[in-house]
UniProtKB/Swiss-Prot annotation:
Biased composition (Basic and acidic residues): 1-20
InterPro entries, A to Z: GAF-like_dom_sf, HTH_MetabolicPath_Reg, Tscrpt_reg_IclR_C, Tscrpt_reg_IclR_N, WH-like_DNA-bd_sf, WH_DNA-bd_sf
Swiss-Prot/TrEMBL GO biological process terms: negative regulation of DNA-templated transcription
Domain IclR-ED: 100-272
Segments for region (Disordered): 1-21
A single GO molecular function term of this UniProt record: DNA binding
Protein known as: DNA-binding transcriptional repressor YiaJ
Species name: Escherichia coli (strain K12)
Function: Negatively controls the transcription of the yiaKLMNOPQRS operon, which may be involved in the utilization of 2,3-diketo-L-gulonate.
Signal peptide: none
Gene this protein is translated from: yiaJ
Entry's induction text: Expression of yiaJ is autogenously regulated and reduced by the binding of CRP-cAMP to the CRP site 1 of the YiaK-S promoter.
Every HTH iclR-type domain range: 23-85
Keyword DNA-binding tagged: yes
């Protein structure tokens, strides 16, 4: 028991040396927020303390401060805590400040009405696709688990594969090597071998669209296309999610046409003009 406490203290001291002076409580509070974001139904104080590498009294004091500001509340389970919906309001304000949302939203809403399906819009951040806008289906019954602000892996999502396909040629191999421990089969359809992914990305570049064929979740399919900026880069992607059974009924071609038109409209507003080497979305 004594060794565990000493080890925890040494870990805390090592981390604190790397932080700017006077910011210890801020860093610790933000760390608790990030941990709690993975426990929507609440996390017990003891487990939260263990995950944070802090003693219970310190965690409890920080939680009290977050509670007083309205960001944390007690969960139904005794001794557990969870985040409040105040984060939704804060996140929405941050997202609304992004010009891309104002540019893309009208086009995405029109696509949502035209298809009746779930519409997703993401940006690229390092080795993830981040969902920054989402519209629920108007006619389809499927409600996906994806949420605004979610970091999605590149290898098993349609929009993620778009970023890999239209990114730097050397990036994919580097990504594969550095994320080998994360690249695991989520379903029997998940691509986990690099040669197979190279083939997949070549097809995506040729067709201008990416598919998630139940690679992330059984029963759910997704079609994505790139959004180009004025420099011909792909900072964003738009996709349609729906049940695999409904996709078979509607047909890929019937969804690809309005999806491509939407991506083209957003790309045009970002200053992109179609070139022979980047004409895939037309």
């Amino acid at each position: 028991m004594g060794k565990e406490v000493m080890g925890k203290k040494e870990n805390e001291m090592a981390q604190e040396k790397e932080r700017p002076a006077g910011s210890q409580s801020l860093f610790r509070g933000l760390m608790l927020i990030e941990i709690l974001s993975n426990y929507p139904n609440g996390c017990p104080l003891a487990h939260l303390s263990e995950l944070a590498g802090l003693n219970k009294s310190t965690v409890h004091r920080l939680l009290q401060g977050l509670q007083s500001c309205g960001y944390v509340t007690t969960a139904p389970a005794a001794g557990s805590y969870r985040l409040t919906t105040k984060f939704i309001a804060v996140g929405q304000k941050a997202l609304s400040s992004l010009n891309i949302i104002h540019i893309a939203a009208p086009h995405l809403e029109a696509l949502n009405i035209a298809t009746g399906e779930t519409i997703n819009f993401s940006s690229r951040e390092d080795d993830h696709a981040i969902l920054i806008y989402k519209l629920e289906p108007t006619t389809g019954m499927l409600r996906t688990r994806a949420y605004i602000g979610q970091h999605m892996p590149l290898y098993c999502s349609a929009m993620g594969k778009i970023y890999m396909a239209f990114g730097h040629p050397d990036y994919v191999k580097s990504y594969w090597e550095s994320h080998q421990h994360e690249i695991q089969p989520l379903t029997r359809n998940t691509i986990t071998e690099l040669p197979a992914m190279f083939d997949e990305l070549a097809h995506i570049r040729e067709s201008g669209a990416a598919m998630d064929r139940e690679e992330n979740e059984l029963g759910v399919s997704c079609i994505a296309v790139p959004v180009f900026d004025i420099h011909g880069r792909v900072p964003y992607a738009v996709s349609i999610s729906l049940s695999t059974s409904r996709l078979k009924q509607v047909g890929e071609k019937n969804l690809l046409k309005p999806l491509r038109e939407t991506a083209q409209a957003i790309s045009n507003e970002l200053g992109f003009t179609v070139r022979d080497d980047l004409g895939a979305i037309t």
